[in-house]
């Protein structure tokens, strides 16, 4: 039963940056002994609110009330000392220091200027035991797993007697076992009467942990769900994006042109048997398969990231010799890779540079001078047309959300003369609203005659977007399904590895 008095309240919180209104009039309550989830599209304002709570940002308007008192923190240390801790996706620890030193950093027990290591390790050991972990407090942090690092962050919060602990996308780098352990710890913290704020785009986690869910959209408060028996996936999606779940994919039948892409018995590292398939102009073909099916490996080979070891790739009936990515680009074939941060973007360069970097060679002045006028116009055009949310074209792309990074990569290829686009997990790690925008870009490309081949491990996405689904299993094609006839049972049946029958 919900308590009558909230422990944490946000009252009319607003935050404005130069040219950007990040939060507007955010008001809601959180109660002790509850996990309160914050949901919304990337850029909805969840992380900004946590940074205000933790003292990273000062609110432009409004106030934070903790246990009946209006609070204002000058920095994160002040917030932590007041019992507010944020566990970020990027953990803020010192690898060369021991577990105990990290837990009590800034308040190491000492006498006469000398650290009392015996007391330090004893106190740290108590915090570790509290979390049910078996870690030597004298171990240098660099020898621990990411999941153990996270436990050290939580122990650090408990050492400051934190009553409010917020988790910002905490499972993004964890194994299944580490996620289970994190959930166990969060449930224990809830039992102890702490306020737990939990930010994640993974709905299965939200439903597994939450006692209440607050939804944000475009920096504004939308709704708080408090009866978890009455809320489902569709209701959350509708609250986040302002439309029904049935509208998310938006597939419609369309006509196709001539064959644009053909693979003839193509093999590449990680592809077990020769792959043959064709994609027509204006057609969207989805590649579905479980982990290890060979989807990404096939695309990397097609794009020249790895070497095709057998077979031939054809574009518009012409054989293409692809030994490196520049050969594929020249032929009109582009790739949005699975790991966009490592392989798709140049993190320390601007949005403008990331959009223009491929087509730049065609627009240099006198063969050697960058055409700044063209680059500025081209970047601004794609920022507007793709609705890339950024303060400006000169913003570093690493500061954008995953969905906006992906749209910038698409803008890069839209600057080229594209015939074929390969999309490898194009919406992984992207919120629902940004996914919808990516789907619309895919449909627009198909309408322009581009052949679209996209790989995804999200089966509802493949079934919802593709005109035709090619199912891969252990490096080979297991079957094909048409959009109108395909269902999850058929696709999974084809994707599951064959089980050899033992003779009794």
From Swiss-Prot:
Keywords: ATP-binding, Cell inner membrane, Cell membrane, Membrane, Nucleotide-binding, Repeat, Sugar transport, Translocase, Transport. GO terms for cellular component: plasma membrane. It is a peripheral membrane protein. InterPro entries: AAA+_ATPase, ABC_carbohydrate_import_ATPase, ABC_transporter-like_ATP-bd, ABC_transporter-like_CS, P-loop_NTPase. PANTHER family: ARABINOSE IMPORT ATP-BINDING PROTEIN ARAG, CARBOHYDRATE TRANSPORT ATP-BINDING PROTEIN MG119-RELATED. Disulfide bonds: none annotated. The gene is araG. Residues 8-243, 256-499 form the ABC transporter domain. ATP binds at residues 40-47. It is found in: Cell inner membrane. The complex is composed of two ATP-binding proteins (AraG), two transmembrane proteins (AraH) and a solute-binding protein (AraF). This is Arabinose import ATP-binding protein AraG. Its EC number is 7.5.2.12. It catalyses: L-arabinose(out) + ATP + H2O = L-arabinose(in) + ADP + phosphate + H(+). SMART domains: AAA (SM00382). It comes from Escherichia coli O6:K15:H31 (strain 536 / UPEC). Belongs to the ABC transporter superfamily. Arabinose importer (TC 3.A.1.2.2) family. One of its GO terms (molecular function) is ATP hydrolysis activity. It is an enzyme of class 7 (translocase). Coiled coil: none annotated.
